């Protein structure tokens, strides 16, 4: 199984968002970190996120890549390290 599949199976978007400091409310909404957002406009689903304000969307790897300005591969490696997933 490749690293991308491993990450997507092991880490939900919500888990990653919470781990990286985003405050998730009861409706799985957060203030979008990708634009100036005062009220939660980003919806966190199990396997993807979507911002109703700026249109940002993607999976857990895309979220980490955008949060930390990383390539998809480097974001996957960061997620693996942060969540204790063996990339081999």
Model-derived segments and spans:
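N-terminal structured subdomain of primase-like DNA metabolism proteins
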Residues: 1-88
